Amino acid sequence: MIQIRELLNETSPNNFTPEHLCALHEQVFSKVYPWAGKFRKVDIAKGDTLFLKHQQIASELKILFSNLANANFLKNTTPTEFSEAIGNFIIHLNLIHPFREGNGRIQRLLVWQIAKNAGLTLDWQSV
């Protein structure tokens, strides 16, 4: 399993897509889960939260990442604007919950990359 720290040190991509999200998941979890990097094929819930039906994952991620691209991947935003926009992005991505396991770790890694690409630094300690 590749260490997330190693990925944090890599250059962030300029383009974020559902395929990039899958690639991150596969890089991190390929030695743990045989389905790493692939969208879940079952419906799941955590507590009282029912996540998006698995048949809708690909289409909803396409919309979510298209909206991010239309916002120029949040480049040239103030820290406040970035926080609000990325907060909404995380809410939607979490409700989609594309993978059976590892969603939170991959979300944080992706958000860190988006922030880095936008010229910002995240401090997860203060979140």
PLM segments and residue spans:
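FIC/Doc superfamily catalytic core
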Residues: 1-127
